[in-house]
Amino acid sequence: MLAYIGRRVVYTVPIMLGVSLVCFALVHISPGDPLVSVLPADASEQLRLTMMRLYGFDRSYPEQFGLWLWRAVQGDLGTSIATGRAVATEVLRAAGNTLRLAALATVIGFVFGCLFGFVAGYFRDSWVDKLASLLSVIGVSVPHYWLGMVLVIVFSSQLGWLPATGAGPGGSSSWVWDWEHVSHMVLPAITMSVIPMGIIARTVRALVAEILAQEFVIGLKARGLNEVGVFAHVVKNAAPTALAVMGLQLGYLLGGSILIETVFSWPGTGFLLNAAIFQRDLPLLQGTILVLAMFFVLLNLAVDVVQTMLDPRIERG
Amino acid sequence: MTQLDRRSFLASSAGAAAGVAAGAGLGLSPAAAQAGGVLRIAMTASDIPLTTGQTDQGGEGQRFMGYTVYDSLINWDLSRSDRSSSLTPGLATKWEVDPANTNRWIFTIREGVQFHDGSTFTAEAAVWNFDKLLKEDSPQFDRRQSAQGRSRIPSIAGYRALSPGVLEITTRAPDATLPYQVAWIMFSSPAQWEAMGRNWDAVALRPSGTGPWRLDRFVPRERAELVPFPGYWDKARVPKTSRMVLLPIPEANARVAALRGGQVDWIEAPASDAIASLRQAGFQITANAYPHNWTWHFARNPGSPWNDVRVRRAANLAVDRQGMKQLLADMMIPAEGFLTPGHAWFGNPTFKLRTDVDAAKRLMAEAGFTPQRPLRTKVLIAPSGSGQMQPLPMNELIQQNLADVGFAIEFEVVEWNTLINIWRAGAAHPSSRGASAMNYSYFIQDPFTAFIRHLATELQPPAGTNWGLYSDPDMDRLFQDLRTAFDPAALDRAMQRIHEKYVDEALFLMVTHDVGARAMHRRVQGFVQAQNWFQDFSPITIAG
């Protein structure tokens, strides 16, 4: 097991290096001016060139990449051009906010996704299956920014039950787990959960149907195991795949949703990315993408390890 | 360590709980829950503007974090809504040019002005602030503030304190527009910079200016809370509310939802399709003319079709501005010139902007074009952008209008920041992709931003932003007259003559002016929407 984990960790190094190169290149080849956030629109070309020098953008791309990577491996992701604040601090604060939101969205998505999936798979072709499948298809298909706006119109503007924007009274820096704050998470978390819920439900439904058709299930029934016992075996067999899918979905959610976080002004990584893109804040953009990519890589690693623990056949494969 | 006994602990806890309970509904820290009312504003910016002095985020940054926390030597008078704003004494009580040497200006510093940290504003502090922006080897040089401020004061060649109360500024050449340039510059406290370890990032969290508001709380990207500065030198402008909370909510529908849901009292730039329903729901909608215009900037390099004045006039006569007003739910002022109608510098142009399709067709025919044999040309536009209003439907309307009189316009659509770079590079640069015009909206508040930067020969790229490479010795002479018009009345007249030439020669496609729409709750009272990019929040009160 340890050798397998060690091997997986070693594999992540070239992946991380590739990710850092790709994210640097993507950010730099896209059109626009990295100083757009610090220069007034009517600044002259001469002033722009002066500022390029002051910010070090007059250096060659390999030189800039080398410097950035060298600092990044030491934990220094640079300084935001637009704000002058350390990128690492900005990203970690935003990631904490997104993590909070993603965790709630994951719980909602996983619980309801599994529920719909197991029910639909277990009662295949019944009306329950059709209803659960319909809900999961809606979850996958509905544009979530649209859903977010509809939820805001209904629950904030019309009914006034839940706040429409922000991360609670006083902002995210004074977060506490009380209803005053949690109420700000409800609408964005529900909006965020619909896609993973749909994906998990569809995956689990197919898995359950496949497992139920296997011979060992017939064997279990033949040995007199009751429905609950059979169901437990089905769940255990479906768990590794469901977990892997959930892990991937959590990775996506941790990336924050630019659209959802913008609609709800939730100060997470999506909101940060949106600001960085529109301000052409290259250090912030690079740093945020890198951290999110690292999250994703590490999350995949963790899922692989947990899957192996649940199903030793994977290690042997 | 101080010992806290049980009784005082209970008393302070009860007080804190009461404060939290009162403030919780407003999303405020306990200190905010006090008399005077709290004004919560949703800005369109995606971040809190730079707090250290010279703000970023354009006009909005200066509006909320510039003229609130800071002052300039010369401020804008924002007390009237019924006329265009003029300059008024700020940290300087008087400024005058030396008659013997018109490159030399003397500013008399206002006595007894204190920064929020208690230190005193002097001419030396002013020099320190100019160094902050212009002198790269000074310890306080801040590249972020420099990027914002340097381009605002192109005429300044030198400055020195003659005494604590007298500041001398010298210019590269005689320039009567200097006071308008200086009005951009915000003055931060040298003492606070020292106290914060000479670190601008630390100052950003606890800045100190001389303005009527003091920054009390700052959560990057989420909120800034300003409180009145009781020691403000202009007692009439000490804020009447107890706190102003600024929230960055860049998405227009999210701002509307926040207003409807009671999370904020005031939103900037509501979505135009939400205005009618907001009004119906009892919210106030305020709007007024302000120095903004929405134009097509014509290229004037050799080969440009816009070098023919008949073509320029025809385009201006073809635009259906009333139709556009309907398109924008009345949230615009149809252009009568480059400046807003009734502006003090409007003058009396002879070419009247109106919709006259027949006259436009005649002019185009004289120039050799008809709807059947149209003038084909390309125009650069962006699908969105600061101040660009609703560029896609607006440009499409103009495209149709112009097609009726003999133009075949092809749009080259680029992203907004790309358009800015093209604008800086000039019409002859390959990045302009052969376009002969560009849709651009302008901040036109002072002589330089309103006129000089667009058409002065010396400001052709890369030296400036004369994108169209326009060059006319007569116009340059008018600019020179303006720069030497040291008497305010003479300056006004010089500005009028320039504006008359802008309109009479149809130097731009002059389409519309934005009206700075804002939506606010009925309890917000006392707001006077000045005809300016900046606004005064001091007189506002919140009704019970």
What are these regions (language model features)?
Chain B
Residues 74-82, 175-239, 243, 251-253, ...:
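Gly/Pro-rich hinge or "lid" segments in bacterial periplasmic/extracellular proteins
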Residues 43-100, 206-210:
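N-terminal lobe/hinge region of extracytoplasmic solute-binding protein
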Residues 518-544:
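Long beta-strand-rich cores associated with HINT superfamily self-processing modules
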Residues 201, 231-277, 408:
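Ligand-site clamp/hinge motif
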Residues 225-230, 279, 306-405, 469-473, ...:
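Append "and occasionally in soluble cytosolic enzymes with long acidic Gly/Pro-rich linkers
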Residues 313, 325, 405-421, 449-521, ...:
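Extracytoplasmic/peripheral linker and loop segments enriched in polar/acidic and small residues
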Residues 108, 120, 127, 143-193, ...:
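Surface-exposed binding/hinge segments that line
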Residues 220, 365-442, 467, 488, ...:
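Ligand/substrate-recognition segments at binding pockets and active sites
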